[in-house]
């Protein structure tokens, strides 16, 4: 997001970029090919059937209108009560069909949204896409696309799609009536006579076509403006969420003035785009209002044209009213195309944002560094050069081999690439060159700031596994061992533990996770930075005591941790890092034999 006078632009607003996106059918078709989708398709057929039944009721009402006014014109007042009763019964049946169709449509909408949300969420979480998207800033506001755009896309697709399916039936049905009732139109030009059959039908189509073309010309920018509005609203919401998440830090810095400025700058984009959208919508609404005013006078035209037939006795009063009703039904049905134009522009914007999400989540992730599995539990690197996304070199890591059961301390000045090395070992950093060998399973990564999910404290301790995977007694014992005895009775208390626990307490929870998972290889990235030196020693001692055969790779700054490692990897600045054996602490570690958890875990 930028803060200058120009709007930030993303690929969903760029026509050239949109050509590389998957076709919209990738969003529309997959659900209907599933077993759940087949049942929803049956429900959708019932909805379409109810729509066509409503059209039949409208046709019946059209015929009823003719009979009603014919009875009045012929002074046959005795038949009026019977006609009114029949009208009431048909109206009640039509209302029941219409309401049933609406309920079924809502059910289909809920089912489709649930499936599409699950499908897109799986794509977001697959292959670490969620991390790659944020790391490389490939997409903004993914949460808004899945939560909000999916809801709007499903709703608008059903509304527009069902409208497109019902309009032809209504138009054809009433066009037949209008063609029959209208008769031929004779014109005399230069002594020649011309006859035009179904002239009222052609007039209705020409009238609606002109309105649609004019509406598109006036509102064509709405697609881009709507997509931009979704993004700008999402950017503004992200800033407010950040204030909530880091409320304490902002309060310590007294940064409310700065945050207010950032929020105002972001919201200025929102307001500017709203005004631009308002201007376009006003033009469209003004035109539509004029059309609506003219439409109220349109029935006079077929009445005047058919007046000679009425005066000559070739057309009854009921026939005249029936023709006017049919003309209104045809123009009203065709009006769907220009009345639904704003909805169509919103649908296009929603579809483009979801297509962009598919484009980003489905392309093969970049992986310049070769990753291989270690059969012996060793961790090794050869020819490893770490780069940033632009290709600039961050650090050159010397070749090293860490045998199973050994413990290595990675040291160096801040910013020299230590944490990036651990990301590369985890397979989360693709930029660079060289080869990495690591165990395929039984590994556990502890970043400096661990993720604490909302829910119970036990769920936070057992993450990423389910809370039911471990007994309460084991979790309580680990809380006591890791210096969290005060929280042991609160194991099943639901809370936002990420805000309730201090930074040091969160790092203690992370150590409890490691001891609970019993991995064979542990990677620690300054995961005790919020603890005092004594607490740090106690947790490292507990780790070695409980996992004596585990391979450990630690990134840390404190020299006191040398006593808990037998190998170091130094990153001097600005020279290249060099690996060496610490002769004073040289010990031969045992091969890894601890119980391995499933897969590589980042917590």
Task: Tell me what each language-model feature is.
Residues 220-223, 234, 249-255, 261, ...:
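Cytosolic ends of transmembrane helices, especially the final helix of ABC transmembrane type-1 domains
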Residues 150-155, 224-245, 251-297, 343-346, ...:
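An intracellular "coupling" helix at the cytosolic face of ABC transporter transmembrane type-1 domains
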Residues 138, 252, 288-291, 355-409, ...:
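Primarily ABC-family ATPase nucleotide-binding module
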Residues 460, 493-588, 594, 603:
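ABC-family ATPase nucleotide-binding domain "signature/switch" substructure
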